[in-house]
């Protein structure tokens, strides 16, 4: 089945079974390997991408659900260079093994898009299903706060209003 979608701002057409997980299309057909396979059951968050701006687990999202949609992977989060979250991750030395980080950052980006100034409780709720084997959760929270401040400082007046 031919499925058309937009990935990281680029229109693509893929040939895949409708029920193939979006993760495998992203990694195997589009060669975007920043999105990781962790559990295959939507439990760890390593495969998190954005589908029309919402964070989804690509390991359980059939590619047919992405037909005509906009998909953003970690590679497309900031076409101009490093995203504020990526810079904050480095500043706070979040990554140890790094395997979960793409999914963590994508989940955090979805949170900040909806909640520009999240509280610790909001961060914990939004991030509680993204697992980090190295347990860098306090640094993840600190990095999200830092990125929120950076994004707020660089927002235009119209963006700040709403």
Predicted regions span which residues?
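Signature of N-terminal electron-transfer/Fe-S-associated modules in redox systems
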Residues: 1-162
């Amino acid at each position: 089945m031919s499925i058309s979608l937009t990935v990281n701002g680029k229109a693509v057409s893929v040939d895949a079974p409708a029920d193939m997980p979006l993760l495998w299309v992203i990694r195997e057909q589009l060669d975007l390997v920043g999105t990781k396979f962790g559990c295959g059951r939507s439990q760890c968050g390593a495969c998190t991408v954005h589908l029309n701006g919402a964070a989804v687990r690509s390991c359980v999202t059939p590619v047919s659900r992405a037909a005509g949609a906009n998909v953003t992977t970690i590679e497309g989060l900031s076409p101009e260079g490093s995203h504020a979250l990526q810079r904050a991750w480095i500043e706070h030395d979040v990554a140890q093994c790094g395997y979960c980080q793409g999914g963590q950052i994508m989940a955090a980006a979805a949170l900040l898009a909806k909640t520009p100034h999240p509280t610790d409780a909001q961060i914990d709720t939004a991030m509680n299903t993204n697992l980090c084997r190295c347990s860098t959760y306090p640094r993840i929270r600190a990095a999200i706060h830092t990125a929120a401040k950076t994004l707020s400082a660089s927002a235009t007046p119209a963006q700040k209003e709403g």
